[in-house]
């Protein structure tokens, strides 16, 4: 499965608002949470990206037999989200990422920092 950075951003934005439990399987005893942003993704996609997010230490997540509990953003997750929260910064970050063909989370954060820095410099001109 390919990494979907928009899904990662959606999960981080939602986890800042509230915690949630997500089923690992369609037939899980846990019902899929009513989170609009997740409607466009499949359960396997969300679970896969939750694993990536957990491996990157952006969220505190517990994986159980039938579900995944998203508990809280880590400090690293908060700082990453600060860089990518604004939609205009996010769009510019994605455009630059595509132009230079890089898409790792680290690269995206670095690009977002540069985009934000550029906005700050331009503001004071």
What does each model-identified segment do?
Residues 15, 53, 81-84:
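Generic structural signal for hydrophobic core residues of well-folded globular domains
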Residues 89-125:
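Membrane-inserting effector segments that mediate pore formation, membrane fusion
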Residues 5-9, 44-47, 71, 75-78:
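Non-catalytic, well-ordered alpha-helical scaffold segments
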Residues 69-100:
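Short, amphipathic alpha-helical interaction segments positioned at domain boundaries
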Residues 51-64:
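A short, conserved structural fragment
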Residues 2-36:
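Short amphipathic alpha-helical interface segments
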Residues 38-41, 61-68, 107:
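Short acidic, glycine/proline-enriched loop segments that cap or flank alpha-helices
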Residues 40-53:
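Short, well-structured hydrophobic secondary-structure segments
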């Amino acid at each position: 499965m390919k990494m979907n950075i928009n899904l990662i951003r959606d999960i981080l934005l939602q986890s800042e608002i509230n915690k949630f439990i997500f089923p690992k399987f369609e037939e899980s005893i846990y019902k899929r949470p009513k989170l609009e942003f997740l409607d466009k993704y499949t359960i396997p996609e969300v679970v896969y990206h939750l694993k990536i997010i957990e491996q990157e230490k952006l969220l505190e997540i517990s994986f159980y037999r039938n579900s995944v509990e998203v508990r809280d953003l880590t400090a690293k997750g908060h700082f990453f989200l600060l860089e990518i929260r604004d939609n205009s910064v996010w769009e510019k970050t994605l455009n630059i990422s595509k132009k230079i063909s890089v898409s790792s989370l680290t690269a995206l954060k670095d690009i977002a920092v540069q985009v934000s820095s550029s906005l700050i410099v331009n503001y004071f001109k």
